[in-house]
Amino acid sequence: MISEERLLKVILAPHISEKSTVNAEKNNTVVFRVAIDATKAEVKAAVAQLFEVEVDSVRTLVNKGKTKRHGARTGRRSDWKKAYVTLAEGADIDFVGGAE
């Protein structure tokens, strides 16, 4: 069992993009930015407990940080992890939370 404190640290934010919106409509998949050290099992448990939905599968990937320049100085943005969470049939997560 994963502690409640860890569950709250696993999911950082929803990742909203054109691709994630199309995925949500077609495949019932939600995209989250997650902690870089989070496992698929932790992501599945966190989504299931925090949003009270049933999760079918989790796919993860690590986006490598880009090298950026500011004048003569070069730096590197941090790596970050993204999780594609496929929800069970009929399950839904509403991030906007509008009136019903």
UniProtKB/Swiss-Prot annotation:
Keywords: Ribonucleoprotein, Ribosomal protein, RNA-binding, rRNA-binding. This is Large ribosomal subunit protein uL23. Part of the 50S ribosomal subunit. Contacts protein L29, and trigger factor when it is bound to the ribosome. PANTHER family: 60S RIBOSOMAL PROTEIN L23A. SUPFAM superfamilies: Ribosomal proteins S24e, L23 and L15e. One of the early assembly proteins it binds 23S rRNA. One of the proteins that surrounds the polypeptide exit tunnel on the outside of the ribosome. Forms the main docking site for trigger factor binding to the ribosome. The keyword Zinc does not apply. InterPro entries: Nucleotide-bd_a/b_plait_sf (IPR012677), Ribosomal_uL23-like (IPR013025), Ribosomal_uL23/eL15/eS24_sf (IPR012678), Ribosomal_uL23_CS (IPR001014). Belongs to the universal ribosomal protein uL23 family. GO terms for molecular function: rRNA binding; structural constituent of ribosome. It comes from Shewanella piezotolerans (strain WP3 / JCM 13877). Pfam families: Ribosomal_L23. GO terms for biological process: translation. One of its GO terms (cellular component) is ribosome.
